[in-house]
């Protein structure tokens, strides 16, 4: 997993969780301002669990599905953190919508300097009722 994280950080990957980077190019952008009361821990670091929650919120604001999909797989690669008061820029750089569900790769960057602090690859399946 460590080698894969290095490849993501360097932008040197082609396929992960069935998402093909070159074939599923995306361009949706979102901004998120983490809440100092809910998103950070006592050391003023963004909670690791909140990275995926932030990506899910951005996806929900972008694509409000009648039936929200359920998570089938997700990998997060952490490269840094953000300071209190700094906004995050989320770039959905690869996106796939299909019969079985959706997948996306989200690059999370600090708004202040554009430094990538996380890569989040998510695969979701459509809900069956």
Positions of PLM-derived features:
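Short tryptophan-centered beta-strand motifs in secreted/extracellular beta-sheet-rich domains
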Residues: 90-92
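Active-site helix/loop of acyl-thioester processing domains in fatty-acid/polyketide metabolism
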Residues: 47-69
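HotDog/MaoC-like acyl-thioester-processing domains
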Residues: 1-5, 82-84, 94-129
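Short, well-structured alpha-helical interface segments that form or flank functional binding sites
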Residues: 46, 50, 83, 87
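Non-catalytic linker/capping segments at the edges of enzyme domains
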Residues: 1-43
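Short structured motifs
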Residues: 73-78
């Amino acid at each position: 997993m460590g080698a894969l994280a290095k490849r993501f950080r360097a932008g040197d990957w082609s396929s992960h969780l069935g998402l093909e980077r070159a074939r599923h190019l995306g361009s949706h952008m979102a901004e998120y301002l983490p809440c100092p009361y809910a998103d950070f821990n006592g050391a003023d670091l963004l909670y690791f669990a909140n990275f995926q929650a932030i990506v899910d919120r951005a996806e929900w604001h972008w694509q409000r599905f009648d039936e929200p999909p359920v998570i089938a797989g997700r990998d997060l690669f952490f490269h840094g953190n953000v300071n209190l008061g700094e906004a995050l820029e989320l770039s959905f750089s690869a996106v796939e919508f299909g019969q079985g569900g959706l997948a996306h790769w989200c690059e999370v960057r600090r708004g202040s300097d554009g430094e990538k602090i996380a890569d989040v690859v998510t695969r979701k399946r459509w809900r069956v009722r």
